[in-house]
Amino acid sequence: MLKSKTIDRVAAAGITLAAAFCLLAMVFSDAIAEAFGGAGVSMEYETELFDTSKIIEIDISMDEDDWAEMLENATSEEYYECDVTINGTTFYRVGIRPKGNTSLTSIANDPDTDRYSFKLEFDQYVDGQTCWGLDKLVLNNNYADATNMKEALTYDMFQFLGADASLYNYAEISVNGEYWGVYLALEAVEDSFMLRNYGVSDGELYKPEGMDGGGGGGFSMNGGGADLNYTVDDLDSYSTIWEGEVTNTTDADHERVVAALQKAGEGEELETYLDVDNLLRYMAVHSFVVNEDSLSGNMPHNYYLYEYDGQLNIIPWDYNLTLGGMGMEAFGGRGGGPGGMSFDGSGSDAGSSAVLQNAVWYSGCFLLLVIALLIAGVYRRRPKIRRRRNRQKALPPGT
């Protein structure tokens, strides 16, 4: 009995120390990043575009016939040439195209609106052109979100916890001088995103989808999609990941991903094969907002997978259906409750589940981050918790 109590006390003390360590790491993250090296790079577009104290003003100028043709053939998602003036600065020969999955097809089938979401690709026609360092800007129409706030609030939470996530701001859009509405502008997850967050742009990036269903590893048996569970060593079994490559990848790159998925699924050397620090922050927000249109939903998609030197990281994407949005009958939702938001090992991401099964990471870090979100909601204005932006392995529990 005495031995049992002693063990319990030691375990409790260990969790308390781990919680204190996590809190100190959040407070002194800049110093940690400097000590470990590999900090992210400050980009000019952070202040030029994503200063949320002021709305972005964007005017798109393009041939009227090209604009009409693009809208008429929106589902082809082909780029057209335009000039874009952002806050008074004009960028010439920019690529523009409609974007989306359900939102794209729904708008295309609606005779009453052409209010698509768009992508602006600044180097589509001019090599090396950027928007203050940004290679691509996403303009979301906040489809199926009557508040026009769900995605913005979610990205604000990610920023507050210091997770690797896109910067955001609202933007007033006009086309050839005609007002087109308010959109949510997002930093695309591409080279400039990697440079800002990791200090390099040579990691491997994927956006798994698999929305057409199929078989083999990488597919969810619950209704299609692209999960992150290890099945076999055969690379072809993970086609939903490779087909979503954003960077140019090779079989050697794919082998590193599969090896990491295997180790993560087995719960082995998690801090070596997963960016545990960022995953805890990602899961805290992700669970808080209940996003079933995601990796943890019935059809896993809407996320980016980043791999560098054999270590995996998850980057969030597409949060307009958070906070019960998937409960809408039109999307076949299950009520928007937390029952479908599980990282318990039975879902589509065994690695994240393994992280939360570690008592120190769960009680000492994950719950602390969720509590921080709750406190921030009560007091509204709050300092942001920074994360050490580097490519070093996450510090092991109890360090």
Which role fits each region the language model picked out?
Residues 211-227, 326-357, 365-368, 375, ...:
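Disordered, low-complexity segments in secreted/periplasmic proteins that are enriched in proline
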Residues 82-141:
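Conserved oxyanion/phosphate-binding beta-strand-loop segments in alpha/beta enzyme cores
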Residues 1-18, 357-361, 378-386:
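N-terminal Sec-pathway targeting helices
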Residues 29-83:
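N-terminal module-boundary/linker segments of secreted carbohydrate-active enzymes
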Residues 161-172, 294-295:
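Short, well-structured beta-strand/strand-turn elements
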